[in-house]
Amino acid sequence: MTAARHDRPRRVVLVFDTSRPMYGLHGLHAAFRGLPGVEVTAIADPGEATARRAAAMEISGATRHYAEVETMFDQERPDIAVICSRHPDEHLAPIRAAAARGIHLFCEKPLAATAAAAREIAALAAASGIKLAVVHPARFDAAFLEMKRLVESGAIGRPLTVIGRGKCDARGGGEDLIVLGTHILDLMVF
């Protein structure tokens, strides 16, 4: 696949229906809908067809469903695959399949369940020449962009300590670290 294909809309496919409970409910399946020059064509999700999936397809604009990711990649021949699951242990297999086919990736965070898997994913992207983006939208929030500008300009001095905080309630702990921690750490190094 080459980056110079601009004569047609970019084809985007979705891996996993994130409208399912415990799959994120982040709306990542709708991230590309309505963007100019983009066509969302299909969702691959192994679960049974449900009203929830039908709604996710309607929201995303996808018109086809596949039970298997590799079949979807081969049939749809997408430019970009969106890995929608927030479960990092589900990312590596579809990323391997996409990289083998030269499909660019937009992946829900956290990228991987282990450092070894993250290194493998980075190596796959580099070796195949694909672009890999991890979903960290908080860095584009106006408040954080202004904070970054103030820090970089020296207007508020040099930060000495940065403290990250999650929900600070019963939902905290390891789950909070996985769900919010990557955003907090991303903002700290942004």
Model-derived features: where do they sit?
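N-terminal Rossmann-like dinucleotide-binding module
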Residues: 1-60
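Short, well-ordered coil/turn segments that N-cap beta-strands
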Residues: 38, 63, 103, 130-131
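Short, Asp-centered acidic motifs that coordinate Mg2+ and/or phosphate
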Residues: 42, 80, 161
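Beta-loop-alpha module in the N-terminal Rossmann-like domain of NAD(P)-dependent dehydrogenases
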Residues: 61-124
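A contiguous active-site-proximal alpha/beta segment in oxidoreductase catalytic domains
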Residues: 112-174, 182-184
